[in-house]
Amino acid sequence: MPADGIRARFRVDYAGFALDVDLTLPGHGVTALFGHSGSGKTTLLRCVAGLERAAEARLEINGELWQDSAAGVFLPTHRRALGYVFQEASLFPHLSVRRNLEYGMKRVDAASRQVSWERVLELLGIGHLLERLPGRLSGGERQRVGIARALLTSPRLLLMDEPLAALDLKRKNEILPYLERLHDELDIPMLFVSHLPDEVARLADHVVLLDQGRVTAQGSLQDIMARLDLPTAFHEDAGVVIESVVAEHDDHYHLTRLAFPGGAVLVARRPEAPGQRLRLRVHARDVSLANSRIEDSSITNVLPATVREVVEADTPAHVLVRLEAEGTPLIARITRRSCDQLGIAPGRRMWAQIKAVALLG
């Protein structure tokens, strides 16, 4: 295994459930552990944290051995350089935000600190909250403080167990940009547990799919989201993720052109400067197909693409079509009738009409 990777082998047996995984993961970026409730996501995270004693285990983090059952090596949780963020921030209610954060810093001597106090406050936007008690914080503010406390331990690995699950939509949207900043600006690998495709699409670089304690698939976010043989393809939010670059702005029509391998799309004017990267989400339900380009249409974003795969959808009336536009994958959810009428089959050249594009971040 390369020194900058994460190797995790765990076997845990409970009555009625067993976790059995053997993973080699990137030692950087965000790896999402994705699956339905009871699939083993949290159990795997607890194993990594040393909170579960697996019958068989080996854990290596960027070249540092934390656990090896065969060799009798077990680093206890308090000696593992990790931060753990739970669904609800476990803050000391009688201590101010400042003192809660200072508690996290006490775990690390000054010489070993990799993330400064000032940097954490700025990244998470909590400087104005320092003198408040936890009871006077909103749900989103509490989670940001909990994440800050984890970061102030200068972790080599950050574990996040559905940190947005307890938040309503407004608070979730409030905290997501801060999580994106952590992803973009800190060189700390993260394991992020979620059961929501849109959360994974927004934050992850790598995805591990779990089901009944087993790994069913893993790979880059783009590859996993484009596969039709996985449960993600049949979710109502199914679709692909595209990494794009701001190409230019059209000040007359107040539009921005976002370019990627295989084409470009126009979206409402963005504030980002040309050259800045943006992640796009194109849902399968927002892609229609045509055998020829329709010029007199209000649909602006149309790409030439080749059909790679056609499979049955979750209803007998629909099919899922995977296409490729010069290396960029797309998925379309269309009726079986349209599929037959258009003669859609692997290898066929078509025009993919994108009715909507979601900007992630």
From Swiss-Prot:
Disulfide bonds: none annotated. Keywords: ATP-binding, Cell inner membrane, Cell membrane, Membrane, Molybdenum, Nucleotide-binding, Translocase, Transport. GO terms for cellular component: plasma membrane. The keyword ATP-binding applies. It holds the Pfam family TOBE. Its EC number is 7.3.2.5. It comes from the Bacteria. It is a peripheral membrane protein. It catalyses: molybdate(out) + ATP + H2O = molybdate(in) + ADP + phosphate + H(+). ATP binds at G35, H36, S37, G38, S39, G40, K41, T42. Residues 1-237 form the ABC transporter domain. PROSITE patterns: ABC_TRANSPORTER_1, ABC_TRANSPORTER_2, MODC, MOP. Its main location: membrane. It is an enzyme of class 7 (translocase). Residues 296-361 form the Mop domain. Belongs to the ABC transporter superfamily. Molybdate importer (TC 3.A.1.8) family. Part of the ABC transporter complex ModABC involved in molybdenum import. Responsible for energy coupling to the transport system. The complex is composed of two ATP-binding proteins (ModC), two transmembrane proteins (ModB) and a solute-binding protein (ModA). PANTHER family: ABC TRANSPORTER I FAMILY MEMBER 10, MOLYBDENUM IMPORT ATP-BINDING PROTEIN MODC 2. This is Molybdenum import ATP-binding protein ModC 1. It comes from Azotobacter vinelandii. The gene is modC1.
